[in-house]
Amino acid sequence: MTKVHFRSYIHKKMILFPQRIDKDIAEDDPVRLLDALVDNLMLDNVYKLYKPSGRKPYHPQMMLKVILYAYMNNIYSCRRIESLLKRDIHFIYLAGYEQPDFITINRFRNRVKKEINNIFTQVVLILAAKGLISLDVEYIDGTKIESKANKYTFVWKRTVEKNRAKLQEQIRTLLLQVDDVIAQDNAAKTEGIEFTAALLDEISKELNKSLESAPEPKTKEEKQAVRTKKKQLKELENKRNKLQEYDQHLEIMGERNSYSKTDPDATFMHMKEDAMRNGQTKPGYNLQIATENQFITNFALYANRTDTLTLSSFLESFKSRYHRYAKTVVADSGYGSEENYLFMDIHNMEAYVKYNYFHKEQRPRYTPNPFSPASLYYNKEQDFYVCPMGQHMKRIGLKRSLTSNGFVTYSVRYQAERCDGCPLRGSCFKARGNRIIEVNHQLQHYKQKARELLTSEEGIKHRGRRCIEPEAVFGQTKYNKAYKRFRHFGKDKVNMDFAFFAIAFNIGKMCRKTNLKELKAVMELLLVTFRCFIQVYIGYLKPNKSFYMKLAA
């Protein structure tokens, strides 16, 4: 029988000369591109977070590389990163054989939570310098991501206000029952006013003094009266504590309608994932992102459930990040409001933003309602509408409305004449008297402008791209990257965690669209100019306004 010869296998052999750690890593591996990219980031503000005294900390560059590479590979657990630093060659290469534990990794993330946004901005500017994005267009969309908090930790504003009102009446009734002179005087003073914890504390102190200065009870009835007073005093103190609790709930909530006890920054919202199909609300955040070529160029977290109230502040955050507004904004009908259209008009943005019923209007079989105000003939010069029967609807007044965001809208009211006996009345309207319509002319103007933009050749192109821009990024985020729920408590930590994710997401996509040689060539050409460019944007330097305008052009 022929002898089989195997390759030499001595797994415990010693090597005379140490080998390079990256010997077995491919030249075009994403870990090399990440390594080169982080080496060229400006981390001066991160270095300032460390104290010169004490034990030498791990290098921030190494920590940043390790965490970003973990996020690129769907690894978000610090314990898992600690484990991979001991056995994964890519992590060992980035760490240079350093092995920080999970506590150190988590502390680093918390340490840089205020500076990670600057690092995200630098990475986006590298993408712009590479020509992968232009920062001239924003494809905007939002999604709700569940918080780490439990879904049964809710506090509802309406419930708190209702119980607080009941408590006020209970306190007023209790004060009337106290037969002490001081309590009666205070009850008279507080008749019809709202009680506060400070006022109840003052009343309790006076009642305590009254009980202490009272003579020693001798008879059975006197002792019973003292016990009753003490019981009432104890009840008053309990109600004071409850009032403090309600006031604290309302202070934490602010303008919101709810919050979570374990994550006060989270608001209860309806999520898309509803396994029970009962419309149950869960604590979460409204995540807004802007994309271009499926790169995340901006992001922000909001407590508002609706996207309409977030657009203007989100566009402002883009300006604060890059010192200029985007030239073009593309969004769905959830953002089409008068306030948002006005904001984009003031700042000279092309608003490819849909409004309600836009898709319905574009259907081939769509026929507009002949009785709706939008279908009626309007004489702009004399300011009147004409109903389907030819009757003039004259202007009768102006209605002022205030949105939940504090924006003031004005609607003009028009009233028809002689609606009694009209053969079309049953189809036109069913209220008594003559028909009254309300028309917001400014909103109608912006809708017409948006309709012209959206149905143009450029608008059709943007509408087609919007479906594959933020929607695709959300799909990759939730399903390919398994980033369906935040893993931290508090808005600042949640913002930090998503900033790490967004940086890793952009670098991963960059790796698929470029190679290491191209990146190094760009880095060598732009090393001097680009570092100054980055310094200006993240606030290290303070140049004049003309220099900003030149960079933003």
Predicted regions mapped to residue ranges:
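Secretory-pathway/luminal and periplasmic proteins that interact with or process carbohydrate-rich
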Residues: 91-96
